[in-house]
């Protein structure tokens, strides 16, 4: 499509993780992390970019490229061909993977809390996080989500419990 679409719903529908960077540096780092998550959990991973992040420019720290050996292709029709008989068996695997991804989301380093003991908290992700930081500065605490699906439910509950008022600042459907 030539116009912007809100792809957040696809992650939940497909039951695969989604990462949302807020700047150029995070785009690079989250791309690498997406591959790591994909290999660890044996699933694809979405990297959600909004127009504002895609068109932004900022300095990026580069590391030395890593050589990664290609794994040999292993034909596995039961895993990759979703005919009804295979899909029924794979559904259990998908649900177990989502449970493990939800656990991972709670400790994932790209989900973080920035707390200075303020009464107001802001939950945000992507470019909306940077907009909130620019507008509100140190007047509020932040829960910055880098992995937006699955969401770190306990982290969000704990963050909300520590604040009198919590705002969610996000980009909405275009």
List each model region and its residues.
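Short alpha-helices
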Residues: 13-16, 174
């Amino acid at each position: 499509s030539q116009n912007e679409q809100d792809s957040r719903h696809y992650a939940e529908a497909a039951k695969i993780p989604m990462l949302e960077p807020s700047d150029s540096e995070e785009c690079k780092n989250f791309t690498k992390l997406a591959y790591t998550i994909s290999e660890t959990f044996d699933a694809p991973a979405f990297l959600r970019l909004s127009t504002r992040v895609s068109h932004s420019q900022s300095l990026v720290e580069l590391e030395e490229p890593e050589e990664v050996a290609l794994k040999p292709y292993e034909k596995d029709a039961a895993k990759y061909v979703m005919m009804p008989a295979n899909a029924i068996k794979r559904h259990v695997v998908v649900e177990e993977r989502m449970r493990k991804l939800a656990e991972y989301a709670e400790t994932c380093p790209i989900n973080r809390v920035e707390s200075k003991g303020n009464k107001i908290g802001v939950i945000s992700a992507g470019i909306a996080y940077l907009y909130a930081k620019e507008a509100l500065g140190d007047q509020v605490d932040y829960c910055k989500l880098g992995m937006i699906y699955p969401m770190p439910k306990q982290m969000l509950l704990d963050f909300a419990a520590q604040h009198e008022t919590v705002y969610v600042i996000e980009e909405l459907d275009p």
